[in-house]
Amino acid sequence: MTASASTRLIAALLATLLAAACSGDSPSARGATPSAGAVNRAAAHKIDDSAAGNVDLGSAKYHVNPSLGATGSVHGTIKLEAPSRADSNGSASRICGSKPAAAARDKAGALVWIVGLSSGKPLPIEKRAELSSEDCLVFPPVQAAVVGTTFNVFNDDKTLHKFVFTRAGTHDTLAVMPFFNAGQVVASERLAKSSGIVEIRCTRHPWTHGYIAVFDHPYFDVTDASGKFSIDSVPPGTYSVMVWQEGMDKPEPHRVQIAAGGSATLDLSGGAGR
């Protein structure tokens, strides 16, 4: 393990211990409402993420089936056009980089999940995830996790950030995280308490935003840089496989039949919200 990796791990562990020791959250760190100025700045950059409120991840009171038997899988490639995002401007570009929007588009991911499964394979044992700010961008810009996941949120920029995490649709504030220096980390168990889409914004850099999809079952994936996804250990049957990406008005359902020992394929391309 390198020195930088060790430092990052130690910081994450300290943040987790601090979060566990706190019975409440400081108003200066969490629970605050974004200022009117922050809302106006975001509106000026014309980021329309209202469609995220239309995404239903399908709570089904999932339970593990210890006698699952033979299963199948679904895989494929999703290459949908991501929307343009506003670039940074002025002095911010000297700190954040000159092309944050292009980087965000290149790394855009699509959510893929199966609906209608109330039982199946076990949930992930490891319920810890990382989120970071790099060049004033959220990485990964789209992430998926299960209910109960603890997030370690890092600031890798030498500039101030104030991340606001809200629930899509209701816009209820889940957490507010101010960052004052590079290397700072905050651990939070608030972001994945229940299923749904969580929106991420920075009040200081309105083009900085991302999404966390929180599921109460394990049958989901996020496409990688090449657009590929894979969901395994699926009980045999016919399912609706949902696909959603920023820019789509609502998730697209795709009917897929999965046989025991087989692998179904789902490939999509074209414009988002076709």
PLM feature segments, named:
Residues L18-A21:
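C-terminal motif of bacterial Sec signal peptides marking the signal peptidase cleavage site
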Residues G24-R274:
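Extracytoplasmic copper-binding redox domains, predominantly the cupredoxin/blue-copper superfamily
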Residues T2-A11:
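Bacterial N-terminal signal peptides that target proteins for export
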Residues L14-T16:
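Hydrophobic alpha-helical targeting segments used for export or membrane insertion
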